[in-house]
Amino acid sequence: MQGRLSAWLVKHELVHRSLGFDYQGIEILQIKPEDWDSIAVISYVYGYNYLRSQCAYDVAPGGFLASVYHLTRIQYGVDQPEEVCIKVFAPRRNPKIPSVFWIWRSADFQERESYDMLGISYENHPRLKRILMPESWIGWPLRKDYIAPNFYEIQDAH
């Protein structure tokens, strides 16, 4: 079974993979990083005018990093807006995903947080820099292979 956006993408021969539906009935799609730019624009034109949230996670040690976008179609007079969840998987060694800041401005801080915590580089983001950690921080704290520094050793050194 396909959701409305997935059916539309198939009809227009746009590459994606349906991952089924979550517990709320929201369709989950997988998009390749190189296709995300065009599918994000198409999603906006299709009516997904609100980026509810963007987050990222480390799929597995040594595996892919995922950037997740929850999009909603906000329309007047509609009590149950249509939603879709889009996952973009990037290789761990050089995780690059096109930024959607220019489509949904609310992606600004959310993409910066994903960069700060996992090291995903959002291409064409206007201010991609750390937002939670100091600029001097080394590494990506939410990666499963991250080794936390020993803060007691650092304090004792002073």
From Swiss-Prot:
First-level EC class: translocase
Key words, A-Z: Chloroplast, Membrane, NAD, NADP, Plastid, Plastoquinone, Quinone, Thylakoid, Translocase, Transport
**EC number(s)?**
7.1.1.-
Chief site of localization:
plastid
Q: Name where it's found.
A: Plastid, Chloroplast thylakoid membrane
Q: Which SUPFAM superfamilies match?
A: Nqo5-like
Query: What's its membrane topology?
Result: Peripheral membrane protein
GO molecular function terms attached to this record? NADH dehydrogenase (ubiquinone) activity; quinone binding
Q: Could you tell me which Pfam families the record lists for this protein?
A: Complex1_30kDa (PF00329)
Q: Quote the catalytic activity from the record.
A: a plastoquinone + NADH + (n+1) H(+)(in) = a plastoquinol + NAD(+) + n H(+)(out); a plastoquinone + NADPH + (n+1) H(+)(in) = a plastoquinol + NADP(+) + n H(+)(out)
Question: What does the UniProt function comment say about this protein?
Answer: NDH shuttles electrons from NAD(P)H:plastoquinone, via FMN and iron-sulfur (Fe-S) centers, to quinones in the photosynthetic chain and possibly in a chloroplast respiratory chain. The immediate electron acceptor for the enzyme in this species is believed to be plastoquinone. Couples the redox reaction to proton translocation, and thus conserves the redox energy in a proton gradient.
By sequence similarity, the record places it as follows: Belongs to the complex I 30 kDa subunit family.
Protein's recorded name: NAD(P)H-quinone oxidoreductase subunit J, chloroplastic
Organism this protein belongs to: Acorus calamus var. americanus
